[in-house]
């Protein structure tokens, strides 16, 4: 039985967020094809994720003990390390990821839990795991010159790669706010892609 961590980074409802419309469909299909897997939903806004304080940083860099697994910050890093698969439902905001997702990434990118330092430098500890990023965007960022502006999916892929997650897929619904676009068709295409990836994820 695999453990999937479903990470939601948007204050909107499942019905009003176009990212969540796709991600909820992904999860629905995933459940159908992986009925024995455990799915843990982590709504970052409901979790009360915040920016790290000086005290938080001191705790993160302190030696880890058995009690660290219950620390209000470190528990998220341990949870992330224990999962086998990750689904990130995070829209593009101003070319990047929502700030709350960056704050969460600061919670989970912890030396000794999700990566470690060696004589050769940093080494990810999450090898063999897989992730998918589901993202809705108002514009189009697949081709130049706008692809150079895209720092949401690129950052998430990079930081997960740093932690050892090399199997990374992306499902995007782009051009949703461009005048004259067929939004219904764009969403339909993204939902079909989500179905296909969910089946074998």
From Swiss-Prot:
Note on how the cofactor is bound: Binds 1 FMN per subunit.
Binding site for FMN: 92-95
Pfam families for this protein: Flavodoxin_2
Enzyme class: oxidoreductase
Family in the record: Belongs to the azoreductase type 1 family.
Function text: Quinone reductase that provides resistance to thiol-specific stress caused by electrophilic quinones.
The name this protein goes by in its record: FMN-dependent NADH:quinone oxidoreductase
UniProt organism field: Caldicellulosiruptor bescii (strain ATCC BAA-1888 / DSM 6725 / KCTC 15123 / Z-1320) (Anaerocellum thermophilum)
Protein's gene: azoR
């Amino acid at each position: 039985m695999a453990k999937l961590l479903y990470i939601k980074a948007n204050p909107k409802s499942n019905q009003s967020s176009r990212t969540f419309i796709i991600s909820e469909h992904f999860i629905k299909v995933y459940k159908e094809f992986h009925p024995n897997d455990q799915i843990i939903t982590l709504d970052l806004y409901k979790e009360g994720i915040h920016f790290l304080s000086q005290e938080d940083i001191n705790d993160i860099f302190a030696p880890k003990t058995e009690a660290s697994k219950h620390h209000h910050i470190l528990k998220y890093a341990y949870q992330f390390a224990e999962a086998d698969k990750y689904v990130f439902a995070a829209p593009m905001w101003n070319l990047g990821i929502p700030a709350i997702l960056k704050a969460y990434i600061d919670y989970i990118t912890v030396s000794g839990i999700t990566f470690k330092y060696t004589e050769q430098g940093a080494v990810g500890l999450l090898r063999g795991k897989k992730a998918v990023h589901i993202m809705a965007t108002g514009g189009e960022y697949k081709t130049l010159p706008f692809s150079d502006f895209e720092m949401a999916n690129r950052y998430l892929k990079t930081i997960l790669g740093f932690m050892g997650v090399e199997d990374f897929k992306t499902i995007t619904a782009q051009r949703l706010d461009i005048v004259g676009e067929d939004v219904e068709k764009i969403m339909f295409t993204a939902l079909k892609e989500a179905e296909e990836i969910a089946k074998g994820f």
